[in-house]
Amino acid sequence: MERATREREKEQREQAQTNDEAQQCPECNSANVITDQSERVCEDCGLVLEDDQIDHGPEWRAFNSSERDQKSRVGAPTTKTMHDKGLTTQIDWKDKDAYGRSLDAKKRNQMNRLRKWQERIRTKDAGERNLQFALSEIDRMASALGVPRSVREVASVIYRRALKEDLIRGRSIEGVATACLYAACRQEGIPRTLEEVTEVARIDQKEIGRTYRYVAQELSLEIQPTDPKEYLPRFASDLELSEEVIAKAREIIDTSAEQGLLSGKSPSGFAAAAIYAASLLCNEKKTQREVANVANVTEVTIRNRYQEQIEAMGFGV
């Protein structure tokens, strides 16, 4: 037993010595050895200690992103926005062969039949059909709202969780899909109001709000209150206002928040009033109606919030 232990310790010492020698330059005995791409090089004298002759890159060359996409022979990465995560193939709808020539009538009919069967076998059961329809709805609404790809991914993940937890039972697929998209916008900090989401949805606002609260509670989603300042860049861009107005609007919101005026107020309405007040203070005047149309709030809301903000800034009414 003791002999085996001594032999093991001896092997460990020899291995450690070998590693130290591998990390040391044989030319100048420097330990300043780095790995640069496929080579181990001494930084002091420049000696190449070890190199890898295998090129792990592609055999083709590309000089811009379009050429790289055209020559690449791998598929797109997996995505949660498709019910099969993008792993299945699809038959093209262009009815052309590999050389770009149009197919004859017999071949076109054959390809149409193959497409139909392929669509049928892609969804094996009711759960997959449910998921396919819901994710297509999320993609449609996300495109209409102009939100980034990350929001679609998050919304798809939330819907998959809701489906797994059987939260869809007794509720419409459109309602849960819309609620998941709204929750994803909130989580990712992409300012979209419930009214804006309702405009692109196929259900009413009351059902969206009710389903959103249910899904958020059942899945324990961590969603922070919307910051009115998140709306400012979009409102200012639509109204063609300068960065000075945005900065002033941020100052107005911060001052109002310090005095507790944000509690119970609509974030979009508060942001719209701040933009209106800032445009007046910076001599880039916009009417209440123009701001209300962009922010999708009423002029009464802007007037009420504007009065509160001006008093908070100490300018009087």
Curated annotation (Swiss-Prot):
Database matches in Gene3D superfamilies: 1.10.472.170, Cyclin-like (1.10.472.10)
Gene: tfbC
Protein name, as recorded: Transcription initiation factor IIB 3
GO cellular component labels: transcription preinitiation complex
Sequence repeats: 136-219, 230-311
TFIIB-type zinc finger segments: 21-50
Region Disordered: start-end pairs: 1-25, 62-83
Basic and acidic residues bias locations: 1-14
UniProt GO BP: DNA-templated transcription initiation; transcription preinitiation complex assembly
PROSITE patterns in the record: TFIIB (PS00782), ZF_TFIIB (PS51134)
Assigned protein family: Belongs to the TFIIB family.
Binding site for Zn(2+): C25, C28, C42, C45
Pfam families cross-referenced by the UniProt entry: TFIIB, Zn_Ribbon_TF
GO-annotated molecular function: DNA-binding transcription factor activity; TBP-class protein binding; zinc ion binding
Keyword annotations from UniProtKB, A to Z: Metal-binding, Plasmid, Repeat, Transcription, Transcription regulation, Zinc, Zinc-finger
Function: Stabilizes TBP binding to an archaeal box-A promoter. Also responsible for recruiting RNA polymerase II to the pre-initiation complex (DNA-TBP-TFIIB).
NCBIfam families for the chain: PRK00423.1
